[in-house]
Amino acid sequence: MGKITFYEDRGFQGHCYECSSDCPNLQPYFSRCNSIRVDSGCWMLYERPNYQGHQYFLRRGDYPDYQQWMGFNDSIRSCRLIPQHTGTFRMRIYERDDFRGQMSEITDDCPSLQDRFHLTEVHSLNVLEGSWVLYEMPSYRGRQYLLRPGEYRRYLDWGAMNAKVGSLRRVMDFY
């Protein structure tokens, strides 16, 4: 079970709303979000309702302002609790759509796809075990995308506007 608290003002001030499960529409509970406290679980936050828009991965900790979670603004409109995975993690990435071209398998965090695999783009992928967060830039920076087990035949399937991938991280409650 997870617990996350959203605050309208920076520094955990102002009106707050506590959540413990997926919520496709947070708009009725607060108008803006400038700080967050994650007491338990790993969460993916979304800029718009129904799990749309920019995504932000948060694990246990305090985030006193939206820059701390790499937010572009104070808009958080939906959230998803990511189920904890206790087994191994495994993903296959491909340089072309529909699982074509060079394939590389990943089983742990990768801070730079360029350094490890000489890749800057991933056009399709297959998440075999565990949930992952894909980052547009190296060192876990830039736009973020939640990847749950399943097939992603093209980058549009994970919500990206292009195939640029800089780093990948396993979703775990600790690092």
Curated annotation (Swiss-Prot):
Coiled coil: none
Keyword Transcription attributed: no
GO molecular function: structural constituent of eye lens
Residues carrying covalently attached carbohydrate according to the record: K3
BP terms from Gene Ontology: lens development in camera-type eye; visual perception
Record domain Beta/gamma crystallin 'Greek key': where: 2-40, 41-83, 89-129, 130-172
Classification via Pfam families: Crystall
Disulfide bridges in this chain: C19-C23
Keywords on record: Disulfide bond, Eye lens protein, Glycation, Glycoprotein, Repeat
Region: Connecting peptide, residue numbers: 84-88
Highest rank taxon of the organism: Eukaryota
SUPFAM superfamilies given in the database record: gamma-Crystallin-like (SSF49695)
SMART domains: XTALbg
Family: Belongs to the beta/gamma-crystallin family.
Function: Crystallins are the dominant structural components of the vertebrate eye lens.
Comment field on protein domains: Has a two-domain beta-structure, folded into four very similar Greek key motifs.
Protein known as: Gamma-crystallin B
Organism of derivation: Bos taurus
This protein's encoding gene: CRYGB
